């Protein structure tokens, strides 16, 4: 494989010295970019864009042409696994993702296959290989998956949810069915991420978007336990280099210590967690990624710069910080504000790495 020209993102995840704090943005390939909208229109719809390796590669690279980002992230969706299990994924205008056949009971779980990453999900691996080739070693490529709990919420609720009553009903009334589903998803995610690593992903991230809706006890039992299983089963080295793993539970700031015990390399923080506090609590064990409020990108560039300076000062001197937003970038953010953010991180962070 091509030698990596910029490895500061991988180095920061492993708490190794870097010249400046690396930065990338969750959903950096997305609707805030006019060029993304043009490519998506060309693809026809969102899943067609995900399933076309050339177009998925194109949208992955678009933000890197605009901004000096330190990593690329595979353009895909967390719902590729449930889709490959045959749940019939479709997107309703204004509604988000929906499934035609949600999972309602243990019998439904038993019927679900564990998808073969090189077969039913082969289009994702083709995209990974294509992106790695086209990146030409400029920056590392991040692969990702949803967490078992987060995938299960969509599969049981039949789509997005505000109150999560359907999956919580299963959790409390039929926990055996939910554990069977989560176990199957943990196996599927492990295979899927390992296939992404073999195809060329140089780091992987597990997005636990909905872990924060659980009580602490339920989080341990129904979310973290299964992420821990995945971390235990991942390839941690490929192509002669360590493959760092980041866990991100949105709304999970109170559980950082437990998350750091999984053996992952880094934890993602949302904007509700104080990064100085997070570093005091777990900075000796893991790197931290985050954690500016994505809505700050609506502010004037001078205000964005102030916020970047505050977060950098909060983390403080030394290694182990990857700058990011606390969640995905909003679709109506002015692209030049994202540029001001990236530039501010690089310019203002140098003093912390001397």
Swiss-Prot record:
It is an enzyme of class 4 (lyase). It catalyses: uroporphyrinogen III + 4 H(+) = coproporphyrinogen III + 4 CO2. Its main location: cytoplasm. PROSITE patterns: UROD_1, UROD_2. Pfam families: URO-D. Its EC number is 4.1.1.37. InterPro entries: UROD/MetE-like_sf, Uroporphyrinogen_deCO2ase_HemE, Uroporphyrinogen_deCOase. It is found in: Cytoplasm. SUPFAM superfamilies: UROD/MetE-like. It comes from the Bacteria. GO terms for biological process: protoporphyrinogen IX biosynthetic process from glutamate. The keyword Cell membrane does not apply. Transmembrane segments: none annotated. One of its GO terms (cellular component) is cytosol. Keywords: Cytoplasm, Decarboxylase, Lyase, Porphyrin biosynthesis. Homodimer. PANTHER family: METHYLTETRAHYDROFOLATE:HOMOCYSTEINE METHYLTRANSFERASE RELATED, UROPORPHYRINOGEN DECARBOXYLASE. This is Uroporphyrinogen decarboxylase. The lineage of its organism: Bacteria, Pseudomonadati, Pseudomonadota, Gammaproteobacteria, Enterobacterales.
